Amino acid sequence: MAYTVNQIITEGIPVRHLEQLEFFEKAGEHGCMTLKGSVEAEEGEALLYGLPQNSPITVRTEDQILFSGIITKLTVTGTENTGMVEVTAHTRSILMDQKKRSRSFQNTAMTYRELAGKILKEYPDSDIFLAIPDVPLGSIAIQYEETDWQFLRRMFSLLKAPLTSLSSSESIRLYAGVPTLQW
């Protein structure tokens, strides 16, 4: 669906005029959004020095979220009156890719959904949808010096199920497998 610039609302960065907006999705990767636009000069300075780590950003229309994620890169340039911002953001699944862990899951009867549930309980309001049969692991699962994202991606790859993140969710929503589409 196509939208006009006037229909796009940004939350998290006070963009006055949107110049460029792109979304990128790829199986096995975090969803990504890049945006370029102008802000008031004083807002640009405040963004440059006052934006905390893992700051959220949402791009929406009046009735639909187009992208919701975490700002991973911010560049501010400008003059006395106007600032330009360039933002790169990733889906909230990027929060799962920040800390390496080592642990084991020794219940071989545990299913892949249960394994994902144990990992995701550390991330508030997170969830996973499986587009594959939920089967037992069948062996011990070891996460060694991997982030939670790397570990789940590897585990689901054993079932040939790509792991993706829903980019229009304000929390971590994962999808394992290939969705079935209704024509």
Model-derived features: positions:
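Assembly/oligomerization scaffold segments
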Residues: 1-102, 158
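Edge/loop elements at the starts and ends of beta-strands within beta-rich repeat scaffolds
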Residues: 26, 81-82, 125-126, 169-170
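Short secondary-structure capping/junction motifs at helix and strand boundaries
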Residues: 68-69, 125-128, 162-164
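Short beta-strand-centered interaction patches in the first periplasmic/extracellular domains
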Residues: 73-75, 84-85, 91-93, 132-183
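Glycine-rich, acidic and aromatic/proline-enriched surface loops and short helix-turn segments
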Residues: 92, 109-129
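Long, intrinsically disordered, low-complexity accessory segments associated with secretion
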Residues: 99-102, 112, 116-117, 148-151, ...
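Second-shell loop/turn segments in exported
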Residues: 100-109, 138-142
